């Protein structure tokens, strides 16, 4: 159940790459993010606002840390999305499947096997291929990579905090921290204005309710049952959905080298997490067929 819910979350994130890219072309970036997380905060407050009192100071601090990491990741990702393509953004974002165990090693002394280092190498090669084929800009791709690092840290910290606190309350504080941070930036830049048009409002409602409030509530709930490494593995499916929706809805054309880079990144993801193949086989119901011998 947790795995299926996370797959649906990645599908929502994949399609919102296209919506967000269209929206921030006509509406200021940080104003968009402030309104998005205001909607997410309001949605969660309606169903669980009273639960925040159960967190105490440690829980409030934990939610704030998660919110700051999440906000940093989303802000950098959206800024990168303004400068590069939907497909590139989606595939580079998938690198957190290898960055998550790497940061786990540095912060929590989690052991890594040789396959993880090989996966990281493949992912870096794939990123280089993507950045060198005139798909968006290298600067935009680097912004997305920086956002991926923040998201990897957020996944690790959710693993530590999720078992300790109420899921709705912790997620609500996360969303509120993001809202306050983006509101301050939007005000400082003079970007805050009333959203207009269905392109902007549609993106705000979908990302606020489904891609933020519901998605991160599901993450906190699921990380009581699944490890950070497995969460990151499932989240890598976002790269597949982003590529598909970017191709179908946004007309992205990566070319053979760009798609080759995407394939190398995905190969790195699978190599870094050996259970990926088995997990994907279970998801699609695939079973190998043994050929009869002569």
Positions of PLM-derived features:
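C-terminal-most transmembrane helix of multi-pass membrane proteins
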Residues: 1-4, 37, 127, 200-202, ...
